[in-house]
Amino acid sequence: DAAAAAWLLVSVSLDGAPALVIVPKDALGADALTREVVIDETRRSYKVRLDGVRVSADQLLSGASAVQTLAHIDLVTSLLVAAEMCGGTASCIDYTVDYLKTRKQFGKLIGSYQALKHPTVDALIAYEQARSHVYAAAHSFSEQGEGEIATRMAKAQAATAMSFAADRAIQFHGGFGFTYDCDAQLYRRRAFWGDSQHGDAAYQRKKLADLMF
């Protein structure tokens, strides 16, 4: 959240190579931050203008150190997003199951129909797989090579699991599920947002193919 941050870590291009710069918030101009519209309205995102900002050499990280640091930041944040999406998936499943246990259609609880039970179980299985991947990634994160593979697996599976669970939540709530009044849309928006952070599931699987084969 750029509006609340005291310092900004900015990725820049320096002579054609990536570099990192630490910028104090008070070095920015009064109109440097512009709130962006993102699909998940519970998130805050800002465009930051750095026009006229000057930094000293000790606020700059360049060369191989910058490349390694950027890669490390990418993996750390990917794992954190994956863990958050696992929690979101569990909450989404609980939300859906509560509805299936209370909503009646034709005199029967809709949760008694196999057409709804089976996809709900599929969502739970996908969640358990994602959670296992997140645990494995956290355990092996510092291991050379293995940590990156496990983290990318976790990110891909967590995004897949939450997207599936959120889609089923909207579907099972019927027409109500497509409205702003139903919280199912919040889970789908969070799934879209999380999947897009640091590479979506397809991107992660492509990187995995390069790492493993």
List each language-model region with its residue ranges.
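Short, glycine- and charge-enriched coil/turn segments that flank and shape catalytic ligand pockets
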Residues: S56-S65, S142-E146
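Solvent-exposed alpha-helices and their adjacent loops that cap or buttress functional pockets
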Residues: D1-A4, S13-D15, V38-R43, S62-S65, ...
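A generic structural signal for well-ordered coil/turn residues at beta-strand boundaries
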Residues: A3-A6, G16-A17, T42-R49, L75, ...
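Structural motif
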Residues: W7-L9, P18-V21, Y46-K47, M162, ...
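A short core secondary-structure module
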Residues: D1-D31
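Alpha-helical interface subdomain recognition
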Residues: H72-F213
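Short, structured patches in soluble enzyme cores that scaffold and shape functional sites
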Residues: S11-L14, I22-K25, G52, D74, ...
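Flexible, small-/acidic-enriched active-site or ligand-binding loops
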Residues: D1, K25-L60
